[in-house]
Amino acid sequence: MTRTVIAQGTFDILHPGHVHYLEEAAAMGDELLVIVARKSNVDHKEKPICPAAQRRDVVAALEAVDDAIVGHEEDIFAPIEAIDPDVIALGHDQHHDDDAIEAELERRGIDCTVERASAREPEREDEILSTRLIIDRILERRG
């Protein structure tokens, strides 16, 4: 039986931290499906710069990812219900409340575990592992 993992996020301006998260998520199962957040659902930080379809295409091109979709406009759990994964892998710094996610999964009858990926430490002094910091650097140098 295939062990399906879902990862999710905004993935605006892909960086090594995103790749680390998705590689760890892929290692949690046999198949990794990624849900890319719609701009309308991003309310915990600045809205993404790149369109959702573009972010999905870039994520889908990664070797660790089997498929990527854009999330539902109104119900962020709708794709999870449709996929019925074995694991939901969260990034180490994602704002989600693990207990609230588990409660909603139980309420909807979705039997899966919620796991957190580890943080990736910079491998070089100048490595940037944050979309916000990449944007800040661009504005600093080109703004």
Curated annotation (Swiss-Prot):
Cofactor(s), names only, from the UniProt record: a divalent metal cation
TM helices/strands, residue ranges: none
Keywords recorded for this protein, A-Z: ATP-binding, FAD, Flavoprotein, FMN, Nucleotide-binding, Nucleotidyltransferase, Transferase
Single biological process term from Gene Ontology: FAD biosynthetic process
Known catalytic reactions: FMN + ATP + H(+) = FAD + diphosphate
Binding site for ATP: T10, F11, H15, P16, G17, H18, D93
Signal peptide location: none
EC number: 2.7.7.2
Top-level lineage group: Archaea
Pathway the protein takes part in: Cofactor biosynthesis; FAD biosynthesis; FAD from FMN: step 1/1
The keyword Kinase is assigned to this record: no
Keyword Flavoprotein part of the UniProt annotation: yes
Assembly: Homodimer.
Role according to the record: Catalyzes the transfer of the AMP portion of ATP to flavin mononucleotide (FMN) to produce flavin adenine dinucleotide (FAD) coenzyme.
Family: Belongs to the archaeal FAD synthase family.
Name of the protein: FAD synthase
Source organism per UniProt: Haloterrigena turkmenica (strain ATCC 51198 / DSM 5511 / JCM 9101 / NCIMB 13204 / VKM B-1734 / 4k) (Halococcus turkmenicus)
High-level lineage: Archaea, Methanobacteriati, Methanobacteriota, Stenosarchaea group, Halobacteria
